[in-house]
Swiss-Prot record:
InterPro entries hit by this protein: Kinesin-like_fam, Kinesin_motor_CS, Kinesin_motor_dom, Kinesin_motor_dom_sf, P-loop_NTPase
Kinesin motor domain span: 345-671
SUPFAM superfamilies given in the database record: P-loop containing nucleoside triphosphate hydrolases (SSF52540)
Name of the featured protein: Kinesin-like protein KIN-14R
Disulfide cysteine pairs (residue numbers): none
Domain of life: Eukaryota
Lineage of origin: Eukaryota, Viridiplantae, Streptophyta, Embryophyta, Tracheophyta
Coiled-coil spans in chain: 189-230, 266-338, 691-742
Species this protein is from: Oryza sativa subsp. japonica (Rice)
Family statement: Belongs to the TRAFAC class myosin-kinesin ATPase superfamily. Kinesin family. KIN-14 subfamily.
Keywords: ATP-binding, Coiled coil, Microtubule, Motor protein, Nucleotide-binding
Spans annotated as Disordered: 1-21, 61-90, 110-169, 759-791, 946-1004
GO CC annotations, alphabetized: microtubule; microtubule cytoskeleton
């Protein structure tokens, strides 16, 4: 069974569960309860059945019916499916609890499972042999198993838990017990009785146990059926699981492929990882190096930052020092210049040569005393024991060498580099050592060499702060001609090229075409100067074996730039060795030497004239009298520093020339050039001054114009304000007058309508009278006095008295009717009263206002003035006392019209048709009057015309009535003052026409 069970197991090792057959235990119990007195011997052999459990939890072992070699008992025993430990995980809890209880209840069956007692006396205690409990768990742990006797085991094994099987088992047990009882009756009867009693009791107990087991068997049977159903379900689940496993296998296969692919990728990634790892190692090393570099860079950055900060601080300090240096340099320059100015811009040094060998042999004595030379004083003894004292800036005795002479000259070299023009020249009698002082010899260098050496020394010291460019040129003035000594192939005295002095734009004199050699060190500069000096004209005279026959002039141009502030300077250094003055009588010069001496003396004389003019501060300085002075104009005209070496001879035979030279030097020393400055062209300066004067004059004129324009603007603004105020007042007054005019027009229209109606009624009454009624004769219109009011009835004035207040002006005086009548009568009786001036008043309703044929009065209102005659139509025709009293009211209207509108009296005196015609004429007149407009002039035009009217009024005072008219103040129409009476008459006609238009407008 173990082999079969193992053959039906899984592939791997499985845990075998060995379960004792519970049926055999039940059979043994039955057999123990059956029988008589004879003991029952139970075989020790026990029937066991071992079932191998599968490894899988889902697998439930079962016994196949068709297995070969299996006994019927095994099949019968296997028909009842017993639970195994392998199923405990999937078996319900109630089944496991029942099995455990059954095992505990089966425990008393061990009494029947002992081995068979041997033949002989009975053992004191019954032994039940062959009973052994044995069980094997899935994990190999032994469990107790019960082995009943063979008969009981076989019966129980074939029972399966059913009732039939139990009955058959009990019968076989009884048979067996009976046989055994007979065999052992003789030996163990007593013992068996005891055992029998015990067995009976045990029988009952076993019976009860058997019943319990049967009940439990039924229960187990039901549980087995349920387990089979569960097994079927598990099989179906197993099939599903197998299908699922197949699908999982397929999926696993796909996963395997995927895994292989991923493995391939993993291999590739591994290779890449290895490569990356190697690269990582390289990068790690590089990163370490970079870290070192970063640390170094950080340290370097810190160092650089420190240096930058230090540089910034140093730069600030440098700027401060630069500013201080610039200020100190400027201050030093100013102080140095002031020091030179204190000493004198023109300084004179006197140097005396020693006596030569010939003079010593001749026994010549010294005429110059140098006792006070340290104080700058020099004493010259004359022929007649007279002494003359000269004072100079420095006096050098014959014993002093070149070095001591140059010690006093050093400051001028510094002035050249500071940007000032410097001129150093030697003056004196021929043979007094001028060339030696200026040029010297190899062992004793002169002023020229030492000055250039000092220039280059200072230039080297200032290197980095200043940049200098030095050029050198050499020329001579020979016989009043300029020669360039640096031109190659030039012979002494030859005039290869004619050079002239020109004035450049900056006011500096320059010689165009002059060779200027640029030099960078002392050797080059001295070589150029020596080249020019060798080409100088030198001749032999009685006074000197090597006499200079020309003025040798070395020009050193210095252009400097201050690298600190960019300031640029341009200066000039003249080193001049003048030719010596000669006395022709003493030297006995002839021919060419005489001409040279004359030109030399001429140029020196011109230099003396220039010095004299400078000393006396003359307005005109004769620089152009000589080429020498023309060249030295920019060095002697006040914008340079000048040093003069006056060379004298100590020989008493040369006292005259010595005194001349010393006197000339004294005059030079007395010149005050003032502060050094840049020279400006005089013509240009005068032109600039003229332009400045014109500009100032133009500025003054412009200021005056601006002032006058400001005053004009202020006055115009004041006038504009006044005119604006006047305009506002006039506008307000116009509004008031317009309102008043509307009211007056309405009242006038009503009054005129009433009068017209009365006139028509009166005409109708007159037309009804008989023709033989006396009709007053009327005089012709031309013979009537239009302005007379003698024939006007007083009743008419009384009728029209209502309109007196209506047409009065509040701003003008009005007369009462009685007063007007008295005035009218007085004027009629007194013809001279017409010549009296009349006031400009508004006309009242009485007729006396028209008795004076004066000009229309000035009105202060824009309201049209009503005419008296315009309000007197139609009038009744009273009985006339004179023919002049027959004037009709319409004649009064026509009398006021100076326009072409004239209405005949016959038109009014006509019949009924004539009245309609008159009405139409009056309506047309009224329509025309309504179309007229009142013209309001602007304030400016009115102010402009007021002056003209004032003049016209003055001229018009003598034009009316043969020179007796009043003053007329025309307002509407300006009157020309040159017309006399004609202008006044013209103005009167215009006023009358305007008033007529106003009267007709009132009728409407």
């Amino acid at each position: 069974m173990e082999e079969e069970g193992s053959g039906r197991g899984g592939d791997g090792p499985a845990a075998h569960g060995r379960i004792g057959d519970t049926a055999s235990l039940g059979a043994s119990c039955v057999r123990a309860g059956v029988g008589g007195d004879s003991p029952v011997m139970v075989s020790s052999a026990s029937v066991r059945k071992t079932v191998k459990m599968s490894e899988t939890c889902d697998f439930i072992p079962y016994v196949d019916d068709d297995d070969d070699g299996n006994s019927e008992e095994e099949n019968s025993a296997s028909s009842g499916i017993l639970p195994c430990d392998g199923m405990q995980h999937d078996t319900p809890d109630y089944i496991r609890r029942g099995a455990a209880a059954a095992r505990h209840r089966i425990a008393p069956l061990e009494l029947f499972s002992g081995p068979s007692p041997p033949q002989g006396p009975p053992s004191p205690s019954p032994a039940i042999g062959g009973a052994a409990l044995e069980a094997t768990s899935n994990d190999g742990v032994a469990e107790p198993q019960v082995h009943p006797p063979e008969g009981i085991s076989s019966i129980i094994s074939t029972g399966g838990g059913e009732q039939e099987t139990a009955t058959m088992g009990s019968q076989s047990v009884h048979e067996t017990l009976h046989i055994e009882e007979n065999e052992g009756k003789c030996s163990c009867c007593g013992q068996l009785k005891q055992e029998y009693s015990l067995l009976l009791r045990e029988k009952e107990e076993c019976r009860r146990v058997l019943e319990d087991l049967m009940r439990e068997n039924e229960l187990k049977s039901r549980e087995c059926h349920e387990a089979q159903a569960s097994l079927h379900e598990l099989r179906m689940e197993l099939m599903r699981k197998s299908m699922h496993v197949g699908s999982l296998a397929f999926a696993v296969e796909g996963q395997v492929k995927e895994k292989s692919r991923w493995c391939q990728l993993l291999n590739d990634l591994s290779e890449k990882f290895k490569a990356l790892k190697a690269e990582h190692q390289i990068l790690l090393q590089e990163s370490l190096e970079c870290k070192k570099f970063v640390a170094d860079a950080t340290q370097m950055t810190t160092t650089i930052q420190q240096h930058v900060n230090q540089y910034a601080s140093l730069e600030c300090e440098f700027k401060d020092l630069k500013e201080k240096f610039t200020e100190e340099t400027k201050e030093r320059k100013d102080l140095y210049n002031k020091l030179i100015e204190v000493k004198g811009n023109i300084r004179v040094f006197c140097r005396c040569r020693p006596l030569n060998g010939e003079e010593i042999e001749e026994g010549a004595s010294m005429a110059v005393d140098f006792e006070s030379a340290k104080d700058g004083e020099l004493i010259v003894r004359g022929h007649v024991s007279s002494k003359k004292v000269f004072k100079f800036d420095s006096v050098f005795s014959p014993e002093e060498d070149q070095e001591k002479v140059f010690e006093k000259t050093v400051p001028f070299a510094t002035s050249v580099l500071d940007g000032y023009n410097v001129c150093i020249f030697a003056y004196g009698q021929t043979g007094t050592g001028k060339t030696f002082t200026m040029e010297g010899i190899e062992d004793a260098r002169g002023v020229n060499y030492r000055t250039l050496e000092e220039l280059f020394r200072i230039t080297k010291e200032r290197q980095g702060l200043f940049q200098y460019e030095i050029t050198v040129s050499v020329l001579e003035v020979y016989n009043e001609q300029i020669h360039d000594l640096l031109l190659t192939g030039t012979q002494p005295g030859a005039t290869a090229k004619r050079l002239e002095v020109r004035q450049v734009a900056e006011g500096v004199h320059h010689v165009p075409g002059l060779v200027e050699a640029r030099v960078t060190n002392m050797n080059e500069a001295w070589e150029v100067l020596q080249t020019g000096s060798k080409a100088r004209v030198v001749g032999s005279t009685n006074a000197n074996e090597h006499s200079s026959r020309s003025h040798c002039m070395h020009c050193v141009m210095v252009k400097g730039e201050n690298l600190m502030n960019g300031e640029q300077t341009k200066s000039k250094l003249w080193l001049i060795d003048l030719a010596g003055s000669e006395r022709v009588a003493k030297t006995d010069a002839q021919g060419e030497r005489l001409k040279e001496a004359q030109n030399i003396n001429k140029s020196l004389s011109a230099l003396g004239d220039v010095i004299s003019a400078l000393a006396t501060k003359s307005q005109h300085i004769p620089f152009r009298n000589s080429k020498l002075t023309h060249l030295l104009q920019d060095s002697l005209s006040g914008d340079s520093k000048t040093l003069m070496f006056v060379q004298i001879s100590p020989n008493e035979n040369d006292v005259g020339e010595t005194l001349c030279s010393l006197n000339f030097a004294s005059r030079v020393r007395g010149i005050e050039l003032g502060q050094a400055r840049k020279q400006v062209d005089v013509g240009e300066l005068s032109r600039y001054k003229l332009m400045a004067g014109r500009a100032k004059q133009d500025s003054k004129n412009k200021d005056a114009q601006i002032k006058s324009m400001e005053e004009t603007i202020q006055s115009l603004e004041a006038k504009n304000k006044a005119k604006d105020l006047l305009t506002m007042n006039l506008q307000e007054k116009i509004k008031e007058l317009e309102a008043q005019l509307l009211v007056e027009r309405k009242i006038a229209r009503q009054h005129v309508d009433n009068k017209i109606a009365q006139d028509h009624l009166h005409q109708q009454q007159q037309s009804k009278k008989p023709e033989n009624s006396p009709c007053p004769t009327r005089s012709p219109m031309a013979e009537r006095n239009l302005n007379s009011t003698a024939e006007k009835p007083v009743t008419l004035l009384k009728d029209l008295g209502i309109a007196r207040q209506m047409f009065s002006d509040s701003n003008t005086d009005t007369y009462s009717i009685n007063h007007l009548m008295s005035m009218s009568s007085e004027k009629e009786n007194n013809p001279a009263g017409g010549a009296q001036p009349t006031k400009a008043r508004r006309v009242s309703l009485c007729g006396g206002a028209h008795q004076q044929p004066a000009a229309p009065p000035r009105r202060g209102s824009l309201i049209p003035l009503p005419r008296r005659n315009s309000l007197m139509l139609p009038l009744p025709l009273p009985k006339p006392a004179t023919p002049a009293a027959a004037a009709s009211p319409l004649d009064m209207i026509t009398e006021q019209c100076s326009s072409p509108l004239v209405i005949a009296p016959n038109d009014i005196r006509g019949g009924g048709g004539g009245g309609g015609r008159n009405k139409r004429i009056i309506n047309s007149i009224l329509r025309r009057s309504l179309q007229k407009k009142v013209i309001i002039r602007p304030p400016l035009m009115a102010a402009h015309q007021s002056g003209r009217r004032a003049g016209a009024g003055v001229a018009g005072t003598t034009t009316h009535g043969g020179g007796g008219g009043g003053v007329m103040r025309a307002r509407r129409v300006p009157v020309s003052g040159g017309r006399g009476g004609g202008g006044v008459q013209h103005n009167r006609e215009k006023e009358r026409g305007w008033n007529n238009g106003t009267s007709l407008r009132q009728l409407n």
